[in-house]
């Protein structure tokens, strides 16, 4: 088959690899000048079932509302639109334990399959992308312990491998933790991973090129046309394919809406910063996450990446206070 893939991030690149490996003729389109230039560029890099827990859970609405009156909160509204409020209303309809458990179990199945595919791909292609093993979640007090329990309850049901640690045990796993930071407990996931998503995507791009994948960068897809031979409409031409796979992140909704497909998406943003490791003894061995503030620190080779501060809204201008 002749297949078009819209988006050259990690989702688009892994899709291109799988299809090209099965001898399909693959073309990848992206509006940027290279792969992994947007959502795959500098995310936390953490691969964890715990981090995949649905945000729609009991107390989420209050967390967002109360965050408007705090100097720092894990989640806040920022230049929102009415569309964002409609999304939050739908999300609030699932803020109960039954919906949370059902949705989380489905996400775990998907992430388990994804993790198995990643391990197989890494083994077959011998990819090195600054990966590390293990994920430590810090609980500052009993309130953090209580908020994490619904997630752990589902993880226990599906047989996920994790351990509840004391403060002393947590510091043995991550000796660089600040001794002045209070730790009530910690949750350790030995099978979780962290890695450089952009580096992984670029490595896979090289593999795809060897398999004959055609890349069209700086090519914005204006629209898609359905039919027996779907068309990808660019600014100056239209190209026909047997199938089209849309991996364009938030831009996917605008491309699919004219075709009658409405994706339940809204815009969430987060901040991240990367820094070189000057003294390995002062850096984490893998990834550490603060449960209360949802801020993570990941070890990526000779660098660390700090990420967090979720904001709902489409304001792409960085807030200076968030960078100070």
Regions found by a protein language model. Give the residues of each.
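N-terminal Rossmann-like FAD-binding beta1-loop-alpha1 element of flavoenzymes
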Residues: 2-28
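Conserved Rossmann-like nucleotide-cofactor binding loop
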Residues: 11, 34, 251
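Short, well-ordered alpha-helices that flank and scaffold nucleotide-derived cofactor binding pockets
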Residues: 17, 21, 202, 206, ...
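Glycine-rich FAD pyrophosphate-binding loop
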Residues: 21-41
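Dinucleotide-binding Rossmann-like beta1-alpha1 core, especially the glycine-rich loop
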Residues: 42-167
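Active-site substrate-recognition segment that forms the wall
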Residues: 43-46, 51, 55-93, 223-229, ...
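Short beta-strand to alpha-helix junction loop
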Residues: 102-115, 137-147, 187-206, 317-323
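Helical element adjacent to the flavin cofactor pocket in flavoenzyme catalytic cores
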Residues: 146-158, 180-235
